[in-house]
């Protein structure tokens, strides 16, 4: 296992020097979910939430979060993102009263460090935005799990999550 790179010789935090790293195309895909009750599911799918179009607001919030990741996570490098795409899908099992919103975020750039944290941050903020906009109806919503599905580019190469189903969803690409 490799050592932690965010510590200096004194054992204190540092931002990793990426000056010498080669620019490559970097892609990261993250997923999370929000489990809601039937009332929220029906109101969201019919765009009847009083605060507005939940998915539209969550999508914009997620994109903004990806762009602001280095402001939120201390050792993240500020990146010039080339693309952020957020997809939503419902997983519904009426007989189990299960209503889960799957959020999939893809972040891309060309640079010298990866975009995993940007994808994970965007997915998390999307889910938090859904919660915020729906909490008046039910504070018992469940967020997560949140995880990296795939990443490519850079020295460490390609990563694909081995577990093909996390949180009840198959990894969809």
Swiss-Prot record:
Q: Where does substrate bind?
A: 75-77, 117-118
Domain of life assignment: Bacteria
Gene3D superfamilies according to UniProt: Molybdopterin cofactor biosynthesis C (MoaC) domain
Q: Which GO terms describe its biological process?
A: Mo-molybdopterin cofactor biosynthetic process
Q: Which residues form the active site?
A: 132
Q: Where is this region: Disordered?
A: 152-173
Q: Name the residue ranges with Polar residues bias.
A: 162-173
Reaction(s) catalyzed by this protein? (8S)-3',8-cyclo-7,8-dihydroguanosine 5'-triphosphate = cyclic pyranopterin phosphate + diphosphate
Which GO terms fall under molecular function for this chain's record? cyclic pyranopterin monophosphate synthase activity; GTP 3',8'-cyclase activity
EC annotation from Swiss-Prot or TrEMBL: 4.6.1.17
According to its UniProt record, this protein's enzyme class is lyase
List keywords of the entry alphabetically.
Answer: Lyase, Molybdenum cofactor biosynthesis
CDD domains linked: MoaC_PE (cd01420)
Which pathway, metabolic or otherwise, does it act in? Cofactor biosynthesis; molybdopterin biosynthesis
- NCBIfam families, alphabetized: moaC, PRK09364.1
Oligomer and partners: Homohexamer; trimer of dimers.
**Similarity comment: family membership:** Belongs to the MoaC family.
Q: What does this protein do, in the record's words?
A: Catalyzes the conversion of (8S)-3',8-cyclo-7,8-dihydroguanosine 5'-triphosphate to cyclic pyranopterin monophosphate (cPMP).
Protein name in the entry: Cyclic pyranopterin monophosphate synthase
Its lineage reads: Bacteria, Bacillati, Bacillota, Bacilli, Bacillales
């Amino acid at each position: 296992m490799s050592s932690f790179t965010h510590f200096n010789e004194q054992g204190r935090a540092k931002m990793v020097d990426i000056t010498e790293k080669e620019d490559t195309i970097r892609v990261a895909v993250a997923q999370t979910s929000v489990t809601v009750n039937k009332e929220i599911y029906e109101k969201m799918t019919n765009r009847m939430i009083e605060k507005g179009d939940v998915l539209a607001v969550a999508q914009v919030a997620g994109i903004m979060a990806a762009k602001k990741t280095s402001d939120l996570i201390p050792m993240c490098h500020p990146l010039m993102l080339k693309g952020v795409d957020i997809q939503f899908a419902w997983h519904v099992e009426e007989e189990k009263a299960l209503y889960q919103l799957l959020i999939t975020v893809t972040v891309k750039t060309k640079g010298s460090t990866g975009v995993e944290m940007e994808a994970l941050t965007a997915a998390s903020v999307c889910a938090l935005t859904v919660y915020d906009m729906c909490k008046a109806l039910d504070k018992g919503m469940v967020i997560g799990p949140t995880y990296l599905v795939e990443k490519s580019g850079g020295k460490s190469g390609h990563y694909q999550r081995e577990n093909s189903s996390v949180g009840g969803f198959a990894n969809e690409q």
